[in-house]
């Protein structure tokens, strides 16, 4: 067992007390990104090492691996802690997204170590999609590079508002304050082009030597700010979904017996309480929340991010992919949207193509009407293109086969994020972030009775070969 972990358990008074304490700590998900060989994996290894999160057998194995694959001479190569693939160790680069967990007395952390190479942009986007903070590493010898700009843009595109610019390898520039100041000014000039209201912080450090990572550096007396670990422990993450209106995508209809019918899913945003009047979209039927069922028993209210089962007072037609929201909220269904797309397939995305898409538990089809532009993510300029290639990022116009209830991705990642699925191979070929829902469905729910809508839904669900049209979306 890790000696530090054993000491923590002893201080808490046993394993059970330690586990309870862990549950009540806040969790921060962050990623490390930057140019090739800026020291991302070394930084994570240093964090794990200096916070005493490495087990004794791992440390022994690290000594052996450092002799075989290490790049730091006689020193421990801490990057090998996270470069787990054999190809990564042999090439000295990161290819896949590596996830690591560690905790301190103040907070729990999940780290995503993302690749820096341009051909692995899709891997980096995947890692960033679940994170709340990004550490952007910059080599003090090289300054701000194209890949630094690219990763900054992708991070902000995926909704990350907190950026920590870690200027690494300060030991190789004699811990120069002038170098740090110059790089800081260069990055701030570039950051003016990034979207959103960003929280940007700068930390000069040396991941190899441990300067300003978990402890203050004696080699940089001119820097009086917090260490990287102190920033991670104290940064306040304001979750956007907490302040957004209620959104509950139904993932599963739970009917274990004749006496129970519940709708299971994760509350995407807002809060819900017993007795609240809710509306089901796209049908528009309303009901009241009778119970909120959780693993720990019934609750009176639930909040964003919690997995719950809702029981309604009325038996109405609700299926996987439907969305529950407050009854007094007017949120129209749309059949078109402009979407920021990160393309992940060898075959380019072209106008006229159709794909299965999945959004908030609902699966339908979408047609690519056009590509407005592709972003040159090295300088953030926009250019017209005929198709979107592998690792390309651009703004695309989509038309859906049926009305969907969408939010902008920056407001709600669950109801604003989607994936593209190839209809033949069933492989995920792209990720999309709703930029703007652009047109309303024209059918009015009041033109059909509740019975007609439920019968139509029943036929389409159980007899798809009949080709019945959607009464709400095909008019």
From Swiss-Prot:
Region G5, residue ranges: 206-208
Coiled coil: none
Record key words, sorted: ATP-binding, GTP-binding, Nucleotide-binding, Nucleotidyltransferase, Transferase
Binding residues annotated for GTP, in chain numbering: 34-41, 113-117, 168-171
SUPFAM superfamilies linked to this entry: EF-Tu/eEF-1alpha/eIF2-gamma C-terminal domain, P-loop containing nucleoside triphosphate hydrolases, Translation proteins
Region G2: start-end pairs: 92-96
Keyword ATP-binding tagged: yes
NCBIfam families in UniProt: CysN, PRK05124.1, small_GTP
Protein name: Sulfate adenylyltransferase subunit 1
């Amino acid at each position: 067992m890790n000696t530090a972990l054993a000491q923590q358990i002893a201080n808490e008074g046993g394993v059970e007390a330690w586990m309870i304490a862990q549950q009540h700590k806040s969790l921060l998900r962050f990623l490390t990104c930057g140019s090739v060989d800026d020291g991302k994996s070394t930084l994570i290894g240093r964090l794990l090492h200096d916070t005493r999160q490495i087990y004794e057998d791992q440390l022994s194995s690290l000594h052996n691996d450092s002799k075989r694959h290490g790049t730091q001479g006689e020193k421990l190569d801490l990057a090998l802690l996270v470069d787990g693939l054999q190809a990564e160790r042999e090439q000295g680069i990161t290819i896949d997204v590596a996830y690591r967990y560690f905790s301190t007395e103040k907070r729990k952390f999940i780290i995503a170590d993302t690749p820096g190479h341009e051909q692995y942009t899709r891997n980096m986007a995947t890692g960033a999609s679940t994170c709340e903070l990004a550490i952007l590493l910059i080599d003090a010898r090289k300054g701000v590079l194209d890949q630094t700009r690219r990763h900054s843009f992708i991070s902000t595109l995926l909704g990350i508002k907190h950026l920590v610019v870690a200027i690494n390898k300060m030991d190789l520039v004699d811990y120069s304050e002038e170098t740090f100041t110059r790089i800081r000014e260069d990055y701030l000039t570039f950051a003016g082009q990034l979207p959103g209201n960003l929280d940007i912080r700068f930390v000069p450090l040396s991941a190899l030597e441990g300067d300003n990572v978990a402890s203050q550096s004696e080699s940089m007396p001119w820097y009086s700010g917090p260490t990287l670990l102190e920033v991670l422990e104290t940064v306040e993450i304001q979750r956007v979904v907490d302040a957004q209106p209620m959104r509950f995508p139904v993932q599963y209809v739970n009917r274990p017996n004749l006496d129970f019918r519940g709708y299971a899913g994760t509350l995407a945003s807002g809060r819900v309480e017993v007795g609240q009047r809710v509306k089901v979209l796209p049908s528009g039927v309303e009901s009241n929340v009778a119970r909120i069922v959780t693993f720990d028993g019934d609750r009176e209210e639930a909040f964003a991010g919690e997995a719950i089962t809702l029981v309604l007072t009325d038996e109405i037609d609700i299926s996987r992919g439907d969305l529950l929201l407050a009854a007094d909220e007017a949120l129209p269904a749309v059949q078109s949207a402009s979407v920021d797309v990160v393309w992940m397939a060898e075959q380019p995305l072209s106008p006229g193509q159709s794909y299965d898409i999945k959004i908030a538990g609902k699966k339908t089809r979408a047609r690519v009407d056009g590509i407005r532009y592709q972003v040159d993510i090295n300088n953030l300029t926009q250019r017209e293109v005929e198709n979107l290639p592998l690792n390309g990022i651009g703004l695309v116009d989509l038309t859906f086969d049926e009305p969907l209830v969408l939010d902008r991705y920056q407001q709600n990642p669950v109801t604003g994020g989607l994936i593209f699925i190839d209809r033949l191979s069933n492989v995920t070929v792209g990720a999309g972030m709703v930029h703007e829902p652009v047109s309303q469905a024209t059918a009015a729910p009041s033109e059909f009775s509740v019975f007609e809508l439920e019968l139509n839904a029943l036929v389409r669900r159980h007899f798809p070969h009949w080709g019945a049209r959607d009464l709400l979306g095909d008019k």
